[in-house]
Amino acid sequence: MPTPSSTKRVKGVQIYRPIVYGNIATPITKENRTSNLPPEHTHRWTVSVKGVYDEDISYFVKRVQFKLHETYTNATRTLDAPPFEVSETGWGEFDIHIKIFFRTESGEKPLQLYHHLTLHPFGPDKEIAKEQNRPVHAYQYEEILFNEPTEAMYEVLTSNKAPELAPKRTGKIMYAQDTEGEEEDRLAEAIKQVQELKEETRKKLIDKEKALAEMKAATGKYPKS
């Protein structure tokens, strides 16, 4: 049997593989703070790319690169083997650039993703979660589509079965078929918070302009800034 080609593609075939990417963050408390931590650091966090149910993805993922905030030492971290994750401590949220490299025989370009490092609780029970110092889980589901894969990659993919998503999410199952609705709720909550912040800022500007106008009316000129 001839060796599968790493350039010739299997026409009319599409194969997907699900992954999740994101972070978990845990508050640093007096009880778990170590002496080597900077005093301003408030959380321990880990950003990762992994299988939906922690299954091995290295049969199609060759390398993962995480680009952190420039204030971190060696801000670009490259992992050539699982677990594809980076753990750090810090105090602020920022965007992490993630680049996923596929196996050479795939002939595919790297996939670039962005994840906003999330340290603080969100959602309807965020206040309770904050009071109880619960870990924050902020992951996103992504389906990687191999469109007309090379013969070699087709053999790799079909030799490793994709996981089947459970119908419903439970305490142990983070992603399931009903997760999309939960993601939509989360996005709606984030949009609501942004709109509330914009409205609060608008009201402050109106109040400031009103105060300046009243001062000008009383003194005949604007105060120096």
Residue ranges: model-predicted function:
Residues 22-148:
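Compact, well-ordered interaction domains used in eukaryotic information-processing assemblies
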Residues 123-225:
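Intrinsically disordered, low-complexity acidic regions
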Residues 1-28, 37:
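Plant-biased recognition of short, low-complexity, intrinsically disordered N-terminal tails
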Residues 3, 62, 115-117, 209-214:
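Aromatic-enriched hydrophobic runs in primary sequence
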